[in-house]
Amino acid sequence: MVTGISEENDDEETFSAVHSSTPSINSQSYAIPITEEMSSSFHDSISTTSNSSGSFDSDGSNVSBVVEQNEMDNESNVDEDLFLDNDIPQSSNLLPTDAQDPGPIFDVSRYIFDSLKQSIDSADFSEALSLQTKTSAVINSKSLELKQYIDEMKSRLTQLQEKFENGEATSKKIKRDLETSRKNIDYLNAALRVDFPIEFNQAREKILERRLNEDHDC
């Protein structure tokens, strides 16, 4: 009886030592924890195996069996973790395809470049260039002609301004001469009417008759 109790104590110490050397189960996300019932049943199986051997030589084989059993449990836990990881879809895969692929972006610069290229290729560029050159030449020649006309008109306008100023002075002089002549005629008429009234009236009648004859002939 004492021998059986000592063997059981030795087996418990060996299991605790082996169990402490194994990797911690808490690091596994989906590992199944070992309950007290599982531990007691595991101890009972170890004690039954040790009693059936009947000697202390079988302790090494029991320890190796326990280590192998723990390694198998760890491998099963790892397989279970891999299965759960594969079974649960990733969050990135749950996104719709429209969100991952927004579609092609409209390139404005590329569109403008293609449009210009098509317009140049479709038209005869050399003909357009020659037409532009001819148009530029015509515009330049007309511009020179207009400049010459403007210069001539400026010089002509200066001459006309000078003539106008001279004509204005001449007209003022003629006006003064006419006024002087009118005064002289009035003075002579008054003097002749007083000094020579008969001759003055005869001369006046002749002048009036001449005017009437001229009007009648017309």
From Swiss-Prot:
The lineage of its organism: Eukaryota, Fungi, Dikarya, Ascomycota, Saccharomycotina. It is found in: Endosome. One of its GO terms (cellular component) is endosome. This is Biogenesis of lysosome-related organelles complex 1 subunit KXD1. Keywords: Coiled coil, Endosome, Transport. It comes from Saccharomyces cerevisiae (strain FostersB) (Baker's yeast). PANTHER family: BIOGENESIS OF LYSOSOME-RELATED ORGANELLES COMPLEX 1 SUBUNIT KXD1 (PTHR37787:SF1). It holds the Pfam family KxDL. Residues 1-62 are annotated as: Disordered. Transmembrane segments: none annotated. Component of the biogenesis of lysosome-related organelles complex-1 (BLOC-1) involved in endosomal cargo sorting. Residues 142-192 form a coiled coil. Belongs to the KXD1 family. Residues 17-30 have a biased composition (Polar residues). Component of the biogenesis of lysosome-related organelles complex-1 (BLOC-1) composed of at least BLI1, BLS1, CNL1, KXD1, SNN1 and VAB2. Residues 39-62 have a biased composition (Low complexity). InterPro entries: BLOC-1_subunit_KXD1, KxDL_dom. One of its GO terms (biological process) is regulation of protein localization.
